[in-house]
Regions:
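Charge-rich, intrinsically disordered N-terminal extensions
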Residues: 1-92, 96-122, 131-168
C-alpha cells in the first residue's frame, strides 16, 4: 500500500491512537487486528457491503495490486459499508479474547469515523447504523460462543485435575 493512499494514515492513525498507553500484550493484539483488517481489505469478499458491481471492480483491481486495491478505488465511506463483513465469523479469530478485541476495535473505529467531518453523512449514515448493529450482534454472538478449553490443563498434576489415580 502506498503511503499516499487515504486509507493508510486513517487506519494507522486510529490504531496508533488506540494503542497509545496500553500494555505490550494489548498493543500486540491491536496489531494483529490491524493486520487482519488490512488482509480483509486486500482479499475479502466485499459484495455484501458494496454490492456486486463495485465488488467486481475491486476484484479486478486486486488483479493488478497485491495490496491497497481497496484504497485505490474506494475510501473511508466504503470502509464503513464493509466493516460488518469483517465481523463475520470467517474473519473473527477463534480465540474469544482476540475476537472480543477485534469487535471492540471495529466499534471504536466506527466511532472515530463518525467524528470525522469530511464525510457526507447523509450518504453513509445508514451504513454506519448497520455497522454499529453488526458490532452489537457480534458481541451477542461472542457471548453465546462456548468457552475456550484451558490449554495448559494437561500440565497440571493428576491430583489437581481431580482425576482418580494411586494418590487417592
Amino acid at each position: 500500500m502506498d503511503i499516499d493512499e487515504p486509507g493508510w494514515p486513517l487506519i494507522d492513525d486510529f490504531f496508533r491512537a488506540e494503542a497509545d498507553g496500553r500494555s505490550a500484550p494489548t498493543v500486540r493484539r491491536y496489531e494483529r487486528v490491524r493486520r487482519r483488517l488490512m488482509s480483509f481489505l486486500d482479499t475479502g469478499d466485499m459484495s455484501l457491503g458494496l454490492g456486486t458491481q463495485p465488488a467486481a471492480l475491486l476484484e479486478a483491481e486486486r488483479q493488478f495490486h497485491d495490496t491497497g486495491a481497496f484504497w485505490t478505488l474506494l475510501g473511508p465511506e466504503e470502509l464503513i459499508c464493509c466493516l460488518p463483513s469483517f465481523l463475520h465469523e470467517t474473519w473473527l479469530p477463534e480465540r474469544t479474547g482476540e475476537a472480543r478485541t477485534q469487535i471492540s476495535l471495529v466499534g471504536r473505529l466506527l466511532t472515530a469515523l463518525r467524528r470525522r467531518h469530511d464525510f457526507d453523512w447523509r450518504v453513509v449514515s445508514c451504513a454506519h447504523l448497520e455497522a454499529q448493529a453488526a458490532v452489537e450482534q457480534a458481541r451477542r454472538d461472542l457471548a453465546d460462543r462456548p468457552a475456550e478449553p484451558w490449554t495448559k490443563a494437561h500440565e497440571l498434576p493428576a491430583r489437581m485435575r481431580r482425576e482418580s489415580g494411586p494418590e487417592w
